[in-house]
Amino acid sequence: MRYKYLLLILAGLWLGGCSSNDKKEEADTPEVNLYNLAQSRISSRNYTGAAEALFRIERSYPFGVYAEQARADLIYVHYMTGNFDASYAAAEKFIRLYPRNTNIDYAYFMKGMTGYYADDGLFSDFLTLNLAKRDVTGAKKSFADLTEFLIRYPESDYVDEARSRLVFLRNLIASNELDSAEYYLKRGAYVAALNRATYIIKNMPNTS
């Protein structure tokens, strides 16, 4: 019985030692090596691997030379892996930590772009037959974020793309509100129908 306890203790010590060695190895990896590894993986489109290297920079060198760029790159790699919620959170974090960064417009732009795709039902719902049940919450959030981006950075390199997305989103949201208004009108819910129509007139006056 004593041997079993001894084996358990030794196993625990061994596992603890492995964990400590892993942490030490990670901390001992130079920041520049981690950054170069991340860039190499981005170039080869290994975005998951790139995210791992960037996380290691953020964890081991939070105030390092490459920390700021690593956090910016995390916005991109999360976006490319389809992890839009994480990309949005990374953009918000970057804006909060580096409001004076020369590329801050990119973070604001990506906030809008991630919202554009984050709602998995955004495009499938656009085709649904039950028009009044479309959920355009994600579209509205994306519309608001991209509008904020255009107001803040009208000279940004990303303006043209943001505007094209806004046209699509505006038409999508207006179509949803109009279909919902008709749906409520047919069922005699006149107040609800009026509210939907008023929303379009007030917020989307130039919708085609």
Residue ranges and their predicted role:
Residues 2, 17-208:
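Acidic, polar-rich low-complexity tracts and alpha-helical solenoid repeat scaffolds
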